[in-house]
């Protein structure tokens, strides 16, 4: 579940700017915001503090314990928890990804590696937001998406006065069994880019399930709602196109650069009134004017 820094972005600017509460953004604008924050979470606070501030984020706290890392970001209106994804050079991250056994919790079975990462981080996170009363938003890419999902679940059970508003994940693996997924009743926008291989692990035959509303980007990078057969055909088309570009689609599609590019295109189409049936499909979240 790779997210090496040099692969994430060459330019540290943000398109999104926070000048109003996040709840007043439509779901595509929120998705772009959290995709950019998930991408920037791979950088040190010294590298991204000015970027966050320029985007309207005044509160910036980086927390880390035993290789598990996250940013706690805040404005006057919102609190955001952005979990960092896998860094191949971090043994703790690699170990977390590889450990696919489940561990029993009071609300269901969880991936033991992902749960251990949150165990490392949770005391610091809970202490930092224990008096927060602003809406809380959770996001992450790859391993960070799994951690964000688990953190949101723990937030629901904690004494933190503010409940999670939503989770936004990009290329996230499955995190737990059906019982756990049914427990995490938090709006979850789960982005999947065509052949992103990380979204297919751990396997369902081990009891793992995905949570939330899947938002699928097809081989053309457009929002789609496809049947199983059409999705298989679309994925094969994606593999073929990648081979022509001398790329391995399963890994190329996991890049946050691609996620951000496709979400930005979808948002631009909406703003220009060029949304097609895929964008307004009733099974996808509604896009409302702002």
Map each language-model feature to its residues.
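Non-catalytic, mobile gating and regulatory segments of ester bond hydrolases
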Residues: 1-139, 143-290
């Amino acid at each position: 579940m790779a997210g090496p820094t040099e692969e994430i972005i060459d330019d540290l600017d943000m398109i999104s700017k926070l000048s109003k509460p996040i709840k007043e953004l439509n779901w595509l604008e929120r998705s772009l915001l959290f995709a950019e924050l998930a991408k920037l979470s791979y950088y040190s606070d010294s590298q991204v503090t000015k970027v966050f501030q320029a985007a309207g984020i005044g509160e910036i706290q980086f927390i880390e314990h035993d290789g598990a890392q996250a940013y706690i970001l805040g404005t006057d209106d919102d609190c955001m928890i952005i979990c960092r994804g896998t860094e191949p050079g971090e043994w703790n991250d690699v170990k977390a990804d590889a450990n696919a056994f489940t561990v029993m919790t009071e609300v269901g079975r969880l991936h033991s590696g992902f749960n251990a990462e949150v165990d490392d981080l949770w005391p610091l996170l809970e202490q930092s937001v224990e008096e927060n009363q602003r809406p809380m938003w959770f996001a992450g890419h790859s391993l960070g998406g799994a951690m964000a999902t688990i953190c949101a679940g723990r937030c629901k059970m904690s004494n933190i006065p503010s409940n999670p508003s939503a989770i936004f994940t990009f290329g996230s693996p499955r995190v737990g069994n059906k019982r756990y997924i049914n427990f995490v009743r938090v709006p979850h926008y789960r982005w999947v880019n065509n052949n992103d291989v990380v979204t297919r692990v751990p396997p369902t035959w081990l009891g793992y399930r995905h949570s939330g509303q899947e938002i699928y980007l097809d081989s053309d990078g457009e929002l789609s709602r496809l049947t199983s057969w059409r999705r298989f055909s679309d994925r094969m088309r994606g593999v073929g196109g990648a081979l022509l570009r001398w790329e391995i689609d399963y890994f190329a599609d996991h890049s946050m650069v691609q996620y951000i590019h496709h979400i930005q295109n979808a948002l631009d189409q909406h703003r220009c009134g060029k949304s097609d049936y895929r964008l307004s499909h009733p099974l996808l979240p509604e896009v409302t004017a702002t």
